[in-house]
Every structure is written in structure tokens, then in C-alpha cells.
Amino acid sequence: MSDHVFVYFRVPEALATEALPHWHRWMETVAEATGIGGTLMRRPETRAGVQTWMECYADVPPAFDATLAGLWRQSGLEQWVDGERQVEHFIDLDML
């Protein structure tokens, strides 16, 4: 079964340009630690001065969440996030 992880969070629009290079480094850190390269996306619209960003990781192993959480605790990136990061799992229907 192919497990995909989507992590979404809010970034204040006023900080988005400054936050972006930090997130590129974060994605590199995750790839180096897990061997899984992710994709960084955002909603096209901004609501109430906040953008919604999302990290997407495909074909992750069961231990991925724990590794990602540990890396996040060490990252220092909380300053760029408005609220909590939400982690969601999806599976390919073709694999059922």
C-alpha cells in the first residue's frame, strides 16, 4: 500500500517571502534525513492575510511521521507558522 503524507499549515502573508528560503532548506533536510523528496505547494489565494502552504511526500514508510516530527522539533521554523501544522495520510485507491 502506498502511503502519502500531506502537511498543511498557515504562513502570514507578510512573512511568506522571508519564510520561503527557510522552507526550501527544510525540504532539503527532510530529503537528506529520510531519502524522500517532497513538494512544497500553497493555495493560490490568501485569506485574512494568511497563506496556506502544504508539504507533500509520496510513498513514505511507517517511520516517516516520527522522523518528520523529530526534525520539526529541531527546526526552529515555528516562528514562520501561524497555528499548528496538520499532518494527513492518504493511500492510493489503485493499491487497494
Where are these regions (language model features)?
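A common structural junction motif
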Residues: M27-A31, W72-V81
